[in-house]
């Protein structure tokens, strides 16, 4: 039996939070003794406390993927003899979580072609590092911090929420997309890296109000405004400004766009996957990309920037027709008060015309995308299932 682990992670519906929950579940199911310490954000830092789940978090309500959350918390609530510490969070928090005379393991991710300069010393505090993609492994290796880097992908969801035909029809009416023959959708926060303005401009350029298409944008309540200060503003206002500018530039009424700038439960997010015909993202880069991963797991075609960690599950251009052409560009400093992104880094940028062309091509002939999506979903079902990835995770944490 492996020795025990003290496991630090967020209990929240973020990429870090959901990926860590799946990893924690895999460790428990593999018989590894684990005590879970839940991280809570506190300004620029975090606090940590042993899990004590007195009620289901709001984001987990009715979510089939989190039905076992109470049981998972109960299985990891008590102290265990441990010789390893796993911190599933950004490296800035590792120093306060790692323990002397223990094997300290950091699980993290990055999205550009170079790591933040201040990460070098933080990464050196770990005994090993776990990242979710080959793209990340290359970036971390280039940093030459002298710490072993292991690639363990995020796990395929073990359950999704079902949505019957009547529920799908009702949701389409509520979202105003009941007349659309093709529904594009995206699930991304409103921040510079996700580049939602390019997607909105491309959609307005690609289609008219008469076209039977729609775009559903699930985003955050607040977003970041224009550089260099990136003021926090309501995402609805930011999106409307982009759409208004695009409409003026095109000189015609826009196609149907529905903005959802609020938090949603896992069940609500899965409902978008169920009614959407194609997931689309003009992101500048992803370490893995859980939104696209879930869409691909369900067999939805993905149209997305062709650079980043998502290539591990979407594949190369020959097998994935949804790869959007890109060029590598300099990254603006962000966030302005304490940047981790710097101009010495590069990420991928897609052009409005190229995205618009890809959207029109999908509507004209979606079958190549659907066939590829079926193959990708089959690969994910086989290669990213818990028994497969769980074994890789245990090996990364325990093979000395």
Located regions from the model:
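Conserved donor-binding/catalytic core segment of Leloir-type glycosyltransferases
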Residues: 5, 177-194, 200-203, 215-217
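Nucleotide-activated donor-binding/catalytic signature segment of Leloir-type glycosyltransferases, i.e.
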Residues: 223-267
């Amino acid at each position: 039996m492996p020795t025990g682990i003290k496991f630090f992670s967020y209990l929240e519906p973020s990429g870090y939070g959901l990926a860590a929950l799946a990893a924690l579940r895999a460790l428990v199911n593999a018989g590894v003794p684990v005590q879970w310490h839940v991280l809570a954000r506190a300004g620029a830092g975090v606090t940590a406390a042993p899990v004590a789940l007195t009620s289901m978090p709001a984001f987990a309500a009715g979510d089939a993927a989190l039905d076992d959350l109470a049981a998972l918390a109960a299985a990891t609530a008590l102290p265990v003899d441990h010789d390893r510490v796993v911190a599933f969070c950004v490296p800035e928090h590792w120093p306060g979580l790692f323990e002397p005379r223990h094997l300290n393991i950091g699980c993290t991710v990055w999205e550009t072609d170079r790591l933040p300069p201040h990460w070098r010393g933080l990464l050196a505090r770990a005994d090993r590092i776990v990242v979710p993609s080959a793209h990340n492994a290359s970036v971390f290796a280039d940093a030459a911090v002298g710490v072993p880097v292991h690639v363990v992908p995020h796990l395929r969801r073990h359950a999704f929420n079902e949505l019957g035909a009547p529920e799908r029809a009702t949701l389409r009416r509520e979202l105003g997309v009941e007349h659309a023959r093709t529904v594009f959708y995206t699930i991304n926060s409103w921040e510079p890296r996700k580049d939602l303005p390019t997607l909105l401009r491309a959609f307005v350029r690609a289609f008219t109000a008469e076209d039977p298409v729609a775009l559903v944008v699930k985003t955050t309540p607040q977003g970041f405004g224009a550089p260099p200060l990136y003021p926090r503003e309501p995402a609805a206002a930011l999106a409307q400004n982009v759409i208004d500018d695009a409409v003026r530039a095109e000189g015609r009424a826009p196609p149907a766009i529905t903005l959802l700038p609020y938090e949603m439960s896992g069940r609500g997010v899965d409902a978008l996957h169920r009614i959407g015909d194609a997931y689309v993202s003009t992101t500048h880069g992803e370490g893995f990309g859980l939104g696209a991963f879930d869409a691909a797991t369900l067999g939805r075609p993905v149209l997305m920037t062709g650079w980043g960690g998502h290539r591990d599950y979407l594949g190369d251009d020959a097998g994935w027709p949804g790869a959007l052409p890109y060029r590598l560009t300099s990254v603006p400093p962000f966030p302005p008060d304490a940047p981790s992104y710097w101009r010495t880094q590069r990420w991928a940028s897609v052009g409005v015309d190229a995205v618009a062309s890809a959207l029109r091509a999908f509507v004209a002939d979606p079958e190549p995308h659907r066939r590829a999506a079926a193959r990708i979903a089959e690969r994910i079902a086989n290669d990213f299932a818990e028994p497969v990835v769980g074994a890789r995770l245990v090996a990364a944490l325990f093979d000395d």
